[in-house]
UniProtKB/Swiss-Prot annotation:
Modified residues (Valine amide): 12
Family listed: Belongs to the periviscerokinin family.
Pfam families: Periviscerokin (PF08259)
Main location (coarse class): secreted
Keyword set includes Transcription: no
Gene Ontology CC: one annotated term: extracellular region
Cytoplasm found in the keyword field: no
Keywords: Amidation, Neuropeptide, Secreted
Protein name per Swiss-Prot or TrEMBL: CAPA-Periviscerokinin-1
Functional summary from the UniProt entry: Mediates visceral muscle contractile activity (myotropic activity).
Locations listed in the record: Secreted
InterPro entries in the record: Periviscerokinin
Signal peptide start and end residues: none
Length: 12
């Protein structure tokens, strides 16, 4: 999604 790659999980 938006922060996919920045956070350890995309959008749960």
């Amino acid at each position: 999604a938006e922060a996919a790659g920045l956070l350890p999980f995309p959008r749960v």
